[in-house]
Amino acid sequence: MEHLNSLEHHFLIAMPNLTESWFDKTVIYIVEDNEHGTMGLVINLEHNLTVPELLDHFELTVEAPENYADQPVLMGGPVDLEHGFILHEPQGTWQKSLPLRDNLAMTVSEDFLKAMADGTAPEKIVVCLGFSGWEKGQLNDEIQANNWLTIPYNEALLFDVPNDQKWQVALNTLGISPESLSMDAGHD
């Protein structure tokens, strides 16, 4: 079995073992994976808030409501649910922005929210509240226990596929249908 040195910029796909957990049928974009642990954002679990409602919460007047009118805020994970994270293309020059790859960045600053409200932010965004985190080695153990599949980063999966289809589409990239998944690992 091939082992990746880092899961950064990959997606995790939840396996059936996680059906009765917070991570049921989730797809997670891995932001960081290093000697301190792993951080990711669930990209397909919708919050009950929309982006305009989130901006309204920050008392930001939405100048261009059509940009994100129906876009839901996502639940990035069960950790720190009050903290927001925005994945976006292109990167830009925001105050608290971390370049992730090519033209992708994660931003956590209010200036980005203001740009969203006034219509000057990038069109390709994923807004999450909370994140998913693992201690060093924990995620690899979960992968070995058959809790997750991994696939490389795919821009279309992140930004273009409807949230309720991301899990199925992610599995399809591996040539797998949900019906063919097993809860049993194929190794010891």
Curated annotation (Swiss-Prot):
Name of the protein in its database record: UPF0301 protein Tcr_1827
Task: Describe the family membership recorded for this protein in Swiss-Prot or TrEMBL.
Answer: Belongs to the UPF0301 (AlgH) family.
Q: Which domain of life is it from?
A: Bacteria
Output the InterPro entries linked to this UniProt entry.
Answer: AlgH-like (IPR003774)
Instruction: Please report a single Pfam family linked to this protein.
Output: DUF179
Which NCBIfam families is this protein grouped with?
A: PRK00228.1-1 (NF001266)
Known SUPFAM superfamilies for this protein? VC0467-like
Can you list the GO cellular component terms from the UniProt entry? cytosol
Q: Which organism is it from?
A: Hydrogenovibrio crunogenus (strain DSM 25203 / XCL-2)
